[in-house]
């Protein structure tokens, strides 16, 4: 099963820059936090650590995803996790009228205005993606 954002964008008939993926990280100081980044980019772990007040941050192991969030890989939504974790959304969302994020089930997306997602998740926006080398 193709869980990539490229596949999701093609199924939706939308540009890839409108499809965001939800990643859960663990910082050395803050514990768990969430990054929502454009689907065609990778999260910059150093940038994520910096904005979340950590010296170091890593993606959580896949086996922790369900117990920590209540979601499985490919169906992790920034909305409705077991607990409200600090959330950071890549700043490119601000230039878009709507973005897509997982609805919490594989294959199901939510189309939402970035401002609404930011308000609902109490997120901060930041530059979170790795630069092309």
Segments the model singles out, each with a brief description of its role:
Residues 1-133:
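Extended, low-hydrophobicity, polar/charged segments
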């Amino acid at each position: 099963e193709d869980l990539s954002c490229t596949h999701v964008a093609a199924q939706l008939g939308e540009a890839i820059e409108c499809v965001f993926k939800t990643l859960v990280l663990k910082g050395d100081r803050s514990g768990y936090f969430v990054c929502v980044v454009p689907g065609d980019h990778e999260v910059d772990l150093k940038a994520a650590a910096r904005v979340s007040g950590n010296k170091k941050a890593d993606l959580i192991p896949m086996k922790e995803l369900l117990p920590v969030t209540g979601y499985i890989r490919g169906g992790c939504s920034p909305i409705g996790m077991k607990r409200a974790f600090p959330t950071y959304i890549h700043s490119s969302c601000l230039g878009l009228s709507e973005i897509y994020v997982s609805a919490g089930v594989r294959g199901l997306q939510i189309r939402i205005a970035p401002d609404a997602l930011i308000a609902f998740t109490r997120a901060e926006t930041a530059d979170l993606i790795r630069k092309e080398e």
